[in-house]
Amino acid sequence: MLCGCLLVFLLGIGGCVGCVACASYLDPNYNGSFDSYYDDDYDGSYDPFDDYGNGDYSDSYSASFTLSEIKDIFGSDLANAVEDGSCSPGIYTVGEDIDPGLYFLEGDPVLEGNFYVFDEEGADSYGIDKSVVYIGHYLTELERGDVIAYLPGDDALRMYPIAKASFAPEAPYQSGLYRVGTDIPAGEYAITPQKDAADNTTNESAAYVMKDLEFDDDSITDTKYVIAGGTQTVTVKDGDYLELFAVVATPADQAEKAS
């Protein structure tokens, strides 16, 4: 894998790992506790950001971009349409194009989508804060001054404030990000591969338990990887977030009855 958040920014890494990788280079005090999560498929031969003078990835946590540069990176063919708070794929400035708050990001149930959040660092200067590859749906907290690039891979998908989300998932739970105690109940879950999603990604199938959506080096409290034919068990409590990346979570009692 090419060293630095800049490649993660463009290509991403599976699930919330992309955010962890960003944290490792955005924060010079990062302690490396998530290094074992990284996918090592990248050989470092491609430098998509050389035009921006960021060849020294060892110092990439300090890299910044203008809004124009961010738009150039992702292309100019995005719709960037907002209708009644619902956003098409595009690039949005929080506080200007959309309101701050918690957002629900639609995604394909079996294919990868991406989003990137940039922090405002100064006048027309932004540093990357989050880089996420996800399957299903996701949530992200946006603050005034942030810039988000929402790239779900399908022009029909939308991003909108959580209050507008009609979301009532039923077990077993497919790929996506869930609020424990709100979207799904606390308890023990059996984690198994979601074959149709796993077939469409080169990243590892896994369940991530997070205590918050800050993506700090201690945000992830548990990770369970699963391979074809395998099963893992994860326990979550109210207030946690459970990300399912190409896996299915079945309540333990339901899984036991089915076995």
Provide a role label for each language-model segment.
Residues 1-27:
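Membrane-embedded alpha-helical segments of small multi-pass membrane proteins
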Residues 23-40:
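Ser/Thr/Pro/Gly-rich low-complexity linker/stalk segments immediately outside membranes or between
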Residues 32, 47, 52-80, 109-169, ...:
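Primarily secretory-pathway and cell-envelope proteins
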Residues 36-45, 58:
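Acidic, proline-/serine-/threonine-rich low-complexity intrinsically disordered repeat tracts
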Residues 78-94, 120:
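Extracellular beta-strand-rich, repetitive "passenger/adhesive" scaffolds
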Residues 87-92, 130-135, 175-176, 229:
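N-terminal post-signal-peptidase region of extra-cytosolic proteins
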Residues 88-102, 176, 180, 185-188:
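A glycine-anchored, Pro-Gly-centered beta-turn/N-cap motif
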